[in-house]
């Protein structure tokens, strides 16, 4: 929001407050002033001058010798090359000794001296707006109004000591997107009187009305308009209006457009002016229809659909509702009859529509945040008065259609609650004074916690919905600087920590220690990733995605990790190991609204990792090989230590059907680990298969308490057991069977380890092993802490394992 200080002070003028103090007050009230600067650079000795006569330079075709009255008591001869110089005009004149601003940013100031131009003496310089750094217009001299007083300092005449404010507004402060809105804040902060422009109804001199129908009350809540005939569109915009527009960052276009823009900046009301003679029949405010097109004022031709609001006549669309008018009914210099429109558009109906077509407008910026719905008629009267004053014409009656206005429900503020939130003592009188200064209507009552204020938000305040909004208003006007800085006071309470539960930070460090690097991805992903890696055909969609590719919430971390692997591979990284800790999102009807939950959605934290390329950094002591399933399985087992994970085959849409496993801790599934499915290697252009895992973070954090075991001083008995079984038999099932047999035999406490150390699959059948069989070799280590194990005990333990394998899997000892 950009505006001049002088314009603001016509609405609210705190006389004893300087520019710097005013800027500071606005910033501390939440209206951050990004920049304050003069409208013109410093210069002096430039005055209003009257060109008395001109004649051609005797030695140059493009120069004129001018006789100028600059109020010095004598006529000055000045040589000028401007194309628009002529007798009778008034222009800025730099006298001898004046110093003009540098022509370029890094240049030096330019001093005016008595000089000769092609042999003719010149005693000054007639100036353009560009030479004074007032604008970029270089079409000729800056022509001043005829009533400009000759000899007056141009800084004083044009108010060039005025300051331009640039305010950075937060999205909730749509009520301050106008001079009126900022002035309301200044009045509340300083006590200055708020003065508004005259918005009295103009005299109605014709009875003409344009038929209007509002077919979409969920798009437009109020539509006001009026016919004005006989306007002069070629009328010049007054200098004072042009000046205020330019100092607000707006370029003067034509009187009709300038008036509309002026009132938008003044009162915050975007409006639109139609050429009445180009409208076919009446207007219909409705949602668009698929396939309809409109050429906009910016020259773009766009196609609308049922999600975009439009204003249409009996033949075609004439305006994109609340965003931009159409080219077909645009006013021109030949326009004589107009239809003036001001409406209340529902913010939800405007939000995101302009961005959809890759442009933005001041109107859309305001309407999508909320514009006052109670003052459309008053603002039309203001615009009409300016049009009649500048362009002339005859005004018809205002046609006001009220169809669906917001219902303002009172918002309660508990005085005790405000004191707790702000940490200060507040009297009832202070809060009441704040609301009165902000023009917020309220009533008082007594509640269980003390006094309660019931505030009804005004029609221009769309940011007041809950109690905290009112507390913020109290804090802003009371003054953040008046709130003393005090350290928080809390009871010191010793709470036991759960030694068996690790923090997320520890889990991250453990992953980093396994040579994985952390990445942080967006929680919204491509819909294709959800289908490919999670078999999710109904993902949670975003209502307003930041990009079309990032349109759904992720239910798995795998897609984001794979994308980052490809990103690194494209930058010539040969070995990539990444992990991420973050939330995923699932539909779950059992989840209710809570402090950290949203009804219908389960949001668990997950930890996932991916490894691609060589298992180790290249070095002379290790043979280079690619990472495999067992490398990553070992990493995962390390993360869960000292808890022991059990693995079982799993089918997962992202993983290889024969090289993937589900992890179980205490019989509960906690995640998956495996090699990427071959079909994704080709589709995502990978030359080898990455290995990845995805685990529940809560399970990783449950480390369990460490248990201490006595170290035996007696020798261990080690036995190797080679058995032949069918190739379909799973090793994990055999290990479980042997451990169960040892426990049943009473030898389970002696078993220090039981591992598979060899596997043999014959290429052809033999007498020892059939074609559909395999040989597995297990090593069991038995050791007691109280005594040396006798051979009978060891043999009995081995025998019970062999018997168990034979009974469960028809295993036989290998000969």
UniProtKB/Swiss-Prot annotation:
Compartment(s): Cytoplasm
Binding positions (Mg(2+)): 463, 469, 472-473
Biological process (GO), any one: phenylalanyl-tRNA aminoacylation
Necessary cofactors: Mg(2+)
Pfam families hit by this protein: B3_4, B5, FDX-ACB, tRNA_bind, tRNA_synthFbeta
EC number(s) given by UniProt: 6.1.1.20
Domain FDX-ACB: 712-814
Cofactor stoichiometry and binding remark: Binds 2 magnesium ions per tetramer.
Keyword Isomerase on entry: no
Keywords for this protein: Aminoacyl-tRNA synthetase, ATP-binding, Cytoplasm, Ligase, Magnesium, Metal-binding, Nucleotide-binding, Protein biosynthesis, RNA-binding, tRNA-binding
GO terms assigned for molecular function: ATP binding; magnesium ion binding; phenylalanine-tRNA ligase activity; tRNA binding
Gene3D superfamilies associated with the record: 3.30.56.10, Bira Bifunctional Protein, Domain 2 (3.30.930.10), Ferrodoxin-fold anticodon-binding domain (3.30.70.380), Nucleic acid-binding proteins (2.40.50.140), Phenylalanyl-trna Synthetase, Chain B, domain 3 (3.50.40.10)
B5 domain ranges (all copies): 406-485
Chief site of localization: cytoplasm
A GO cellular component entry from the record: phenylalanine-tRNA ligase complex
Alphabetized SUPFAM superfamilies for the sequence: Anticodon-binding domain of PheRS, Class II aaRS and biotin synthetases, Nucleic acid-binding proteins, PheT/TilS domain, Putative DNA-binding domain
SMART domains the UniProt entry points to: B3_4, B5, FDX-ACB
Ranges of residues in domain tRNA-binding: 40-155
Subunit structure: Tetramer of two alpha and two beta subunits.
Family, similarity comment: Belongs to the phenylalanyl-tRNA synthetase beta subunit family. Type 1 subfamily.
Protein name as catalogued: Phenylalanine--tRNA ligase beta subunit
Organism of provenance: Cupriavidus pinatubonensis (strain JMP 134 / LMG 1197) (Cupriavidus necator (strain JMP 134))
Lineage summary: Bacteria, Pseudomonadati, Pseudomonadota, Betaproteobacteria, Burkholderiales
Gene name linked to the record: pheT
């Amino acid at each position: 929001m950009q505006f001049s200080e002088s314009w603001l002070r016509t609405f609210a003028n705190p006389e004893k407050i300087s520019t710097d103090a005013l800027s500071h007050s606005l910033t501390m009230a939440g209206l951050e002033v990004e920049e304050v600067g003069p409208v013109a650079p410093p210069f002096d000795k430039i005055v209003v001058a009257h060109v008395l006569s001109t004649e051609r330079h005797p030695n140059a075709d493009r120069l004129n010798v001018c006789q100028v009255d600059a109020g010095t008591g004598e006529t000055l001869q000045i040589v000028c090359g401007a194309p628009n110089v002529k007798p009778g005009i008034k222009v800025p004149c730099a006298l001898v000794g004046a110093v003009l601003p540098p022509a370029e940013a890094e240049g030096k100031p330019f001093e005016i001296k008595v000089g000769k131009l092609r042999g003719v003496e010149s005693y000054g310089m007639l100036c353009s707006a560009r030479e004074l750094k007032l604008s970029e217009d270089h079409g000729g001299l800056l022509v001043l109004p005829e009533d400009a007083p000759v000899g007056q300092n141009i800084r004083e005449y044009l108010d060039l000591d005025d300051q331009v404010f640039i305010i950075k507004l937060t999205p909730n402060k749509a009520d301050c997107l106008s001079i009126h809105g900022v002035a309301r804040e200044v009045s509340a902060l300083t006590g200055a009187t708020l003065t508004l422009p005259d918005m009295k109804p103009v005299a109605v001199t014709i009875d003409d009305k344009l038929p209007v129908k509002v077919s979409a009350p969920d798009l437009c809540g109020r539509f006001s308009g009026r016919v004005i005939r006989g306007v002069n569109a070629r009328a010049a915009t007054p200098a004072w209006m042009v000046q205020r527009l330019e100092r607000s960052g707006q370029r003067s276009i034509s009187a009709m457009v300038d008036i509309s823009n002026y009132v938008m900046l003044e009162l915050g009301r975007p409006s639109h002016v139609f050429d009445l003679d180009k409208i076919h029949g009446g207007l219909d405010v409705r949602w668009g229809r698929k396939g309809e097109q409109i050429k906009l004022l910016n020259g773009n031709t766009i196609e609308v659909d049922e999600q975009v609001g439009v204003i249409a006549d009996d033949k075609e669309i004439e305006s994109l509702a609340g965003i931009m008018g159409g080219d077909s009914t645009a006013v021109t210099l030949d326009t004589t009859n107009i239809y003036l429109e001001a409406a209340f558009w529902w913010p939800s109906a405007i939000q995101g529509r302009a961005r959809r077509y890759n442009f933005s407008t001041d109107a859309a910026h305001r309407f999508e945040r909320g514009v006052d719905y109670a003052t459309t008629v008053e603002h039309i009267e203001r615009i009409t008065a300016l049009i009649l004053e500048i362009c002339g014409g005859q005004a018809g009656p205002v046609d006001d259609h009220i169809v669906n206005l917001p219902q303002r429900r009172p918002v309660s503020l508990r005085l005790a609650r405000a004191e707790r939130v702000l940490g200060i003592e507040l009297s009832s009188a202070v809060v009441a004074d704040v609301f009165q200064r902000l023009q917020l209507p309220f009533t008082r009552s007594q509640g269980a916690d003390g006094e309660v204020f019931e505030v009804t938000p005004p029609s221009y305040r769309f940011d007041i919905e809950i109690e905290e909004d009112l507390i913020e208003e109290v804090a802003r006007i009371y003054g953040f600087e008046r709130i003393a800085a005090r350290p928080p006071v809390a009871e010191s309470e010793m709470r036991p920590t759960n030694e068996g539960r690790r923090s997320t930070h520890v889990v991250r460090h453990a992953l980093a220690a396994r040579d994985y690097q952390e990445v942080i991805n967006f929680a919204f992903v491509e819909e294709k990733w959800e289908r490919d890696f999670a078999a999710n055909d109904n993902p949670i969609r975003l209502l307003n995605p930041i990009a079309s590719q990032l349109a759904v919430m992720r239910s798995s971390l795998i897609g984001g990790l794979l994308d980052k692997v490809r990103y690194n591979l494209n930058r010539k990284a040969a070995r990539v190991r990444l992990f991420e800790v973050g939330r995923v999102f699932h539909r779950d009807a059992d989840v209710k609204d809570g402090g950290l939950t949203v009804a219908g959605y389960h949001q668990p934290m997950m930890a996932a990792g991916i490894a691609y390329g060589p298992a180790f950094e290249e070095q002379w002591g290790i043979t280079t090989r690619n990472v495999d399933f067992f490398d990553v399985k070992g990493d995962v087992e390390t993360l869960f230590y000292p808890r022991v994970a059990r693995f079982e085959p799993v089918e997962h849409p992202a993983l290889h059907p024969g090289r993937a496993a589900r992890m179980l801790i205490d019989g509960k599934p906690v995640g998956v680990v495996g090699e990427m499915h071959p079909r994704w290697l080709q589709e995502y252009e990978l030359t080898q298969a990455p290995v990845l895992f995805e685990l529940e973070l809560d399970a990783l954090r449950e480390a369990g308490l460490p248990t201490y075991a006595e170290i035996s001083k007696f020798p261990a008995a080690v036995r190797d057991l080679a058995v032949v079984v069918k190739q379909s038999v799973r090793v994990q099932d055999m290990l479980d069977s042997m451990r169960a047999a040892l426990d049943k035999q009473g030898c389970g406490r002696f078993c220090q380890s039981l591992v598979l150390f060899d596997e043999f699959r014959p290429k052809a059948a033999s007498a020892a092993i059939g074609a559909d069989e395999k040989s597995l070799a297990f090593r069991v280590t038995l050791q007691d802490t109280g005594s040396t194990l006798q051979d009978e005990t060891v043999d009995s333990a081995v025998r019970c394992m062999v018997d168990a394998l034979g009974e469960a899997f028809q295993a036989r000892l290998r000969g």
